[in-house]
A protein has these predicted regions:
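Carbohydrate-associated surface elements
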Residues: 210, 228
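Nucleotide-activated donor-binding/catalytic signature segment of Leloir-type glycosyltransferases, i.e.
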Residues: 292-315
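Glycosyltransferase donor-sugar binding loop
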Residues: 277-293
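Membrane-proximal helix-turn-helix segments that form the acceptor-binding/catalytic region
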Residues: 127-131, 184-203
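Acidic donor-binding loop of glycosyltransferase active sites
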Residues: 322-336, 349
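Conserved acidic donor-binding segment of nucleotide-sugar-dependent glycosyltransferases
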Residues: 368-375, 384-389
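Conserved donor-binding/catalytic core segment of Leloir-type glycosyltransferases
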Residues: 238-255, 261-265, 279
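A charged, aromatic-enriched C-terminal amphipathic alpha-helix characteristic of glycosyltransferases
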Residues: 390-420
Length: 423
C-alpha cells in the first residue's frame, strides 16, 4: 500500500523524539514493502536519512505571519512566496526548538481546529497535492495537534465522492508538553478541538499503554504501537573500557542534563565507581547555550572524564550508544516512550531513569528506576547498577531481549498493518 506521512520538523539541530519516531515508523513500513511518501510541514528536513518526497507545506515563516496579520483576508502571493523562501526558512530553523508555546497560540489552535484564512489556503495546497499527485491508500498524520488536516481531508474526500478514500491514521503523543504551556483558556480550546476532530481519523495510535490510559478521556479506541528500530544497526560487540554514563537527547533543562551532571559529580567525589566517565550528545539550539555553560561549570572539576559532542546527526546515533555503558536522561516531565531507551536496548545497553511517566512500562528489567527524580537518588541508582554483583550483566541481557521482542521494526510494521486492515 501507499502511505503519505505528514510530519513536522524541528530543524534537525538536536535529537527530536517525535521527528525520530516518525522516521522510524516510515522506515519500518518501507522495509515491509510499502510505498512511503514523506510530506514535511513547518520546516525542511535536513537529515540525509530522512528526506522529503514532496514540497514543504505550511512553511513555519509564512504560516506564522499569516496567522498574525492575515486573519480575515488571504496573504498576498508575493509575500507568501518571500516568507517561504529558503533564506527565511534557514533563519527559522536556527531559532527552532523552543520549549514554550508562548506566542504560538493562533498557529496551534488553527491547526487543531482546521480553521482560519491562512489554514484554509495552505491546507488546500496540501490536499490538491495528495489527491492529484499521490493517490495514497493511507495518510499518516504524525501528531494530534495536526488533526485539523484530518478534518479538511475527510471533508474533501466526501466532497469528491471517492469510492475508496484514503484511510487516515493520527498519532497522539506528548501533546500536553506543548498545549499545557498555552494560556488556560487556549489550552482548554486546544484539548476540546483535538477531542472533537479526532473523529475524522479512522484510527488513533500512541506509543505506550501509559499514554493511552492518561488520555483515555480524550482519545477513545486508541491503539498502542511501540516504536521499533532496525536493531541490526545497533548490534555490537564493542564496549567502553571504563564505565561510561551516556546522555543522548536535547541538551536542555527539561531533559535533565543538569541533574545528571550533579549526580556524576557526586559519584566522582565518592569514588565508588572507579574510572567513571560521562559522554553527552544529542545536540542543542542557540537557546540552550546559556544552560550548557552552567552544566560545563558543574562538570569542570572532572572535565578530563567528560566528553560533550558539539555536533549532532542522525547517522551518529548507533555509534554513540556503542561508546557508553548505560543511558540516563532524567527528564523533568512525563514522556510517553523515550526513543533513546529503545536505542540503548538495541545496543544491549541498560538504562537508569526516573520512575515517572511510561518508564516503568518501557524499561521493565532492562535497567533501574529511581524516585524521587533528583541528583542524589539518580547517583544512588547508578552506583547500584555498577557495583551490585551481576546486576549490570542481567540488565544488559534484558535490554537485548526487550529490543528483539518488542521494539523491533518488523514487529512495528506488522502491528500498524493489522490496524490499517481493520479500518
Amino acid at each position: 500500500m501507499k502511505i503519505v506521512f505528514i510530519i513536522t520538523s524541528s530543524g534537525d539541530a538536536y535529537y527530536c523524539g517525535n521527528c525520530f519516531r516518525d522516521n522510524l515508523m516510515a522506515q519500518a513500513m518501507k522495509r515491509a514493502g510499502h510505498e512511503v511518501v514523506i510530506m514535511p510541514i513547518y520546516l525542511p528536513l535536513r537529515q540525509k536519512e530522512f528526506q522529503a518526497d514532496t514540497p514543504l507545506f505550511f512553511p513555519a515563516t509564512s504560516y506564522y505571519v499569516g496567522q498574525k496579520f492575515f486573519k480575515k483576508k488571504p496573504m498576498p502571493a508575493w509575500l507568501k512566496k518571500l516568507l517561504g523562501a529558503q533564506p527565511l526558512l534557514d533563519i527559522a530553523m536556527s531559532m527552532a526548538g523552543t520549549t514554550t508555546s508562548d506566542g504560538m497560540e493562533d498557529m496551534t489552535l488553527s491547526m487543531i481546529h482546521g480553521e482560519g484564512t491562512t489554514f484554509d489556503d495552505m491546507v488546500r495546497e496540501m490536499i490538491d497535492w495528495i489527491v492529484t499527485k499521490e493517490h495514497p491508500d493511507v495518510v499518516y498524520i504524525s501528531s494530534s495537534m495536526l488533526v485539523g488536516i484530518a478534518k479538511a481531508l475527510k471533508q474533501e474526500f466526501k466532497k469528491l465522492k471517492m469510492a475508496l478514500p484514503p484511510k487516515i491514521v493520527c498519532v497522539a503523543q506528548d501533546e500536553e508538553v506543548w498545549i499545557d504551556g498555552l494560556r488556560e483558556e487556549d489550552a482548554t480550546l486546544a484539548w476540546r478541538g483535538i477531542a472533537e476532530n479526532l473523529k475524522y481519523a479512522d484510527a488513533v495510535i500512541t506509543t505506550s499503554l501509559y499514554y493511552k490510559e492518561k488520555m483515555a478521556s480524550l482519545f477513545n479506541a486508541v491503539h498502542v504501537v511501540y516504536p521499533g528500530l532496525e536493531i541490526e544497526k545497533y548490534a555490537t560487540e564493542e564496549h567502553p573500557a571504563n564505565p561510561t554514563i551516556g546522555f543522548f537527547y536535547r541538551m536542555n533543562k527539561a531533559d535533565g542534563l543538569d541533574v545528571l551532571a550533579e549526580a556524576f559529580v557526586m559519584l566522582k567525589q565518592k569514588g565508588s565507581v572507579p574510572h567513571l566517565k560521562l559522554r553527552i550528545g544529542g545536540g542543542y539550539t542557540s537557546n540552550d547555550k546559556p544552560f550548557l555553560r552552567q552544566v560545563r561549570k558543574v562538570l569542570a572539576p572532572y572535565k578530563e572524564d567528560v566528553v560533550i559532542e558539539d555536533t549532532y546527526d542522525w547517522a551518529h546515533h548507533a555509534a554513540f550508544y556503542k561508546k557508553v555503558s548505560v543511558i540516563c536522561v532524567p527528564l523533568q516531565f512525563e514522556e510517553s516512550v523515550g526513543l533513546y531507551l529503545l536505542e540503548a536496548f538495541a545496543t544491549g545497553v541498560p538504562v537508569v531513569e526516573p520512575d515517572e511517566g511510561s518508564f516503568s512500562e518501557i524499561v521493565g528489567n532492562a535497567g533501574l528506576l529511581y524516585h524521587p527524580n533528583d541528583a542524589l537518588h539518580l547517583a544512588e541508582a547508578l552506583e547500584k547498577l555498577f557495583t551490585t554483583p551481576g546486576l549490570y550483566e542481567q540488565s544488559c541481557k534484558a535490554a537485548s531481549k526487550l529490543s528483539a521482542e518488542r521494539y523491533n521494526c518488523c514487529i512495528v510494521a506488522e502491528k500498524l498493518e493489522e490496524i490499517i486492515k481493520t479500518i
